[in-house]
């Protein structure tokens, strides 16, 4: 469960995100979409505990991220769009390091299963410098999944993946939701959002302009009936660069 209540983030006098409230239940996949600069990454970084809110509260699995950050962060995984890896650790050593960090005692049998799921078994002894951009992304996601987080935050998770890798990643994301994780997926790929997400949150200039299933959004905005998600996105945000 992810609960966001009246989250606001200011940088000086500049409002990055204003009065944002939503909930992601276990098993839900929330698509976070908006134009560049809308506040998507700021929101994800706040949910990950990297940025402190100016006001409002965030709870991960019922735990307040501000008052008990260690416990809250232990229940989430944030995979940014640029993988953060260690140059001198192999693929397997990355996972072993994460296991120690999160106290995953049963990591031994879990690591090869994750490597197989994300098609990294053949690269288990490789260093990051020997990996393609897509393989680095897969490794970052494997590290995020190792401790079986209750909340999964994904920022452009398909970056650098080939078509086979994209298909595999979609299966992985859907599987984690079925297992009960609350998932937030931020992406400019609207077809991916429409395929994977149970609900959509559209933000513009740091504010929510739509939240719900496609049917619920259309119900609140009858003028959007019969339009594609791309057309709805443009109408809601005024952004002609959607793709």
Regions found by a protein language model. Give the residues of each.
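ABC ATPase "signature
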Residues: 211-212
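Catalytic Walker B motif of ABC-type/P-loop ATPase nucleotide-binding domains
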Residues: 152-156
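Conserved ABC ATPase signature
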Residues: 127-134
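A short, surface-exposed alpha-helical micro-motif characterized by mixed small hydrophobic
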Residues: 193-195
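Conserved ABC transporter NBD signature motif
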Residues: 56-67, 71-72
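Conserved ABC ATPase "signature" region
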Residues: 96, 100-123
């Amino acid at each position: 469960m992810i609960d966001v209540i009246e989250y606001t983030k200011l940088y000086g006098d500049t409002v990055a995100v204003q009065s944002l409230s939503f909930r992601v239940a276990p098993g839900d996949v929330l698509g976070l979409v908006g134009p560049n600069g809308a506040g998507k990454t700021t929101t994800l970084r706040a949910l990950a505990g990297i940025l402190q809110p100016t006001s409002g509260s965030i709870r991960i699995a019922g735990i307040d991220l501000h008052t008990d950050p260690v416990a809250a962060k232990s229940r989430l995984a944030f995979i940014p769009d640029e993988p953060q890896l260690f140059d001198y650790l192999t693929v397997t050593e990355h996972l072993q390091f994460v296991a120690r960090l999160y106290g995953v005692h049963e990591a031994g049998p879990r690591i090869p299963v994750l490597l197989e799921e994300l098609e990294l078994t053949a690269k288990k002894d490789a260093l990051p410098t020997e990996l393609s951009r897509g393989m680095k992304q897969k490794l970052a996601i494997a590290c995020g999944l190792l401790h079986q987080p209750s909340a999964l935050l994904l920022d452009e998770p398909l970056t650098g993946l080939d078509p086979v890798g994209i298909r595999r990643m979609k299966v992985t994301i859907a599987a984690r939701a079925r297992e009960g994780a609350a998932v937030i997926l931020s992406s400019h790929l609207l077809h991916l959002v429409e395929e994977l997400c149970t609900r959509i949150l559209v933000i513009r200039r740091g504010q929510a302009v739509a939240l719900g299933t496609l049917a619920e959004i259309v119900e609140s905005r009858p003028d959007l009936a019969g339009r594609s998600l791309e057309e709805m996105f443009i109408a809601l945000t005024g952004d002609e660069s959607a793709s």
